[in-house]
């Protein structure tokens, strides 16, 4: 485990896996992942920032695709971004607060859908020749997925994927945009990736 400044990294199955503090739109990787909505229409938070930074061709490309199911992923060029591609994945909504049995079942399904977001994004990246990819904290904003649970699902999903697909990537990053998310992700990263 290497720790320097605002990132922590390790090696797993021939891949550098890291948690970094920064802005997803500034990452110099083959693919950045966008926490999109089903209509791929842009929005607020990370989705809005990516649409703004990628420029006016991105909305047109998203309209041509039209729709993305929750738990699935689609790809567009990166346009004005440093990344060659943007993978748009739609994370699940989370039933927050006091929930009944139906709410508990919804949240169990939400965890499966969130794991699918990571798996489908990684598969799509490989299919398009990508060797480096950066993920935001999918579903933790407007979709109200608790950050600790979402981060654990993200890291477990990536770990499982790499164990099943050794050396599929050179680097996988989890990009955290504020101090609280970074501290949380750092702790969960150490829990999941410590030898």
What do the PLM-derived regions correspond to, one by one?
Residues 94-195:
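Phosphate/ribose-phosphate-bearing ligand recognition and processing surfaces
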Residues 1-127:
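Glycine-/small-residue-enriched capping loops at alpha/beta junctions
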């Amino acid at each position: 485990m290497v720790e320097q400044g605002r990132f922590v990294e390790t090696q797993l199955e021939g891949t550098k896996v890291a948690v970094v503090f920064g802005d997803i739109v500034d990452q110099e990787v083959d693919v950045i992942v966008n926490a999109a909505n089903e209509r791929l229409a842009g929005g607020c938070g990370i989705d809005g920032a990516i649409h703004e930074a990628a420029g006016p061709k991105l909305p047109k490309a998203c309209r041509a695709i039209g729709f993305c199911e929750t738990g699935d992923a689609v790809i567009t060029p990166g346009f004005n971004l440093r990344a060659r591609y943007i993978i748009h994945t739609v994370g699940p909504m989370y039933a927050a607060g006091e929930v009944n049995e139906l709410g508990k079942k919804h949240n169990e399904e939400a965890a499966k859908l969130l794991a699918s977001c990571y798996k489908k994004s990684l598969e799509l990246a490989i299919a398009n020749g990508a060797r480096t990819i950066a993920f935001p904290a999918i579903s933790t904003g407007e979709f109200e997925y608790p950050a600790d649970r979402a981060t654990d699902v993200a890291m477990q999903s990536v770990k499982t994927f790499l164990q099943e697909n050794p050396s599929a990537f050179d680097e996988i990053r989890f990009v955290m945009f504020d101090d609280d998310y970074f501290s949380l992700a750092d702790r969960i990263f150490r829990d999941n990736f410590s030898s």
